[in-house]
Design a protein with these regions (language model features):
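Ubiquitin-like/PB1-type beta-grasp interaction modules and other compact soluble beta-rich domains
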Residues: 1-158
Length: 158
């Protein structure tokens, strides 16, 4: 159940998600996306330091710095594709069409993914992270009304 904590070894989780880990952020590809998670009508914080190990002075190419939900993609290569499933793999929180973090989409409760305020079909783990893409995951009673953000106010230069 949320909130979901950070994993004990963020470097191992990042590598398991197929991501590069470096002592510095990559510079070949640099953009930001944003994630909101809503469970039973309440926001769940996306923690800072997903994909970051201050102890090992290492950082994944896909990471968070704070709990605003901003996802940083700072990669050493330009042509790699990044997905929401990779972020959740680093976070060590299960994400699939069947549910999120132990919460099952069973008909009574649903998991719906949105991009730019529009519902998406399929497995939310496959959602591609794109520049300034607003992604929202909503879990809760089927048919419940939830205000889904259409966009995020990215700081200048982000």
């Amino acid at each position: 159940m949320p909130p979901w904590p950070l994993p004990a070894d963020p470097v191992a989780r990042a590598k398991a998600a197929g991501l590069d880990v470096q002592p510095m952020e990559g510079t070949a590809k640099h953009f930001h996306a944003h994630l909101d998670v809503i469970v039973n009508g309440k926001p769940v914080k996306v923690p800072g330091n997903i994909g970051v190990s201050p102890a090992q002075q290492a950082m994944s190419e896909l990471h968070t710095h704070d709990d605003t939900g901003m996802i940083h993609i700072e990669a050493p290569t330009a042509n790699k594709r990044y997905t929401l499933g990779q972020l959740f793999g680093e976070w060590q929180v299960k994400l699939s069409a069947a549910g999120i973090g132990g919460l099952k989409a069973d008909g009574k409760n649903t998991l719906v993914a949105y991009a730019g305020g529009k519902p998406l079909s399929g497995d939310p783990a496959t959602i591609e992270l794109l520049p300034h893409r607003q992604i929202t995951l909503v879990y809760g009673p089927a048919g419940a009304k939830v205000d889904v953000p259409k966009s995020y106010n990215f700081p200048p230069g982000q």
